[in-house]
């Protein structure tokens, strides 16, 4: 009887370890028109058992971001700029995204090159761990394996047509 329970427990742990990632940072919409001003939304869920306390997004070189919606209540926003003054990313901090919750961060941008744009993001949790969403983007409809709390997960991708 005890051996059966141990086997069942081991199987449950193995299944959880191989579970697909059900939540990751997304950029919406996933398909945009070339040279059209677009409202982009970065959707950030908290998929760990620790709240999210900061989010950094690196903008793809093929998209010019030029305006930001106000940061959600309790959050501050800091634009990241290149040496030439162009906006290359944004950092949101100061608030929390509770366990099981999500928050949207919105800004305007214009894509100026066709093809796939990759939006790398870095999610900081209340325990100080940073989850890089900087790996290769998933294929449409694919669900990646969970890579753990600090290993790179798939970056978000937007197709420019």
Label each region the model flagged.
Residues 1-8:
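Bacterial N-terminal signal peptides that target proteins for export
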Residues 8-18:
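Bacterial N-terminal signal peptides
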Residues 32-34, 124-161:
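Extracytoplasmic/periplasmic copper-protein system
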Residues 35-69:
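Low-complexity, serine/threonine/proline/glycine-rich extracellular segments that form mucin-like
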Residues 35-40, 104, 116-119:
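Short, solvent-exposed loop/turn segments enriched in Ser/Thr/Gly
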Residues 60-88, 136-139, 153-158:
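A surface/secretory-pathway sequence property marking extracellular, secreted
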Residues 95-115:
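Low-complexity, intrinsically disordered segments enriched in Ser/Thr together with acidic residues
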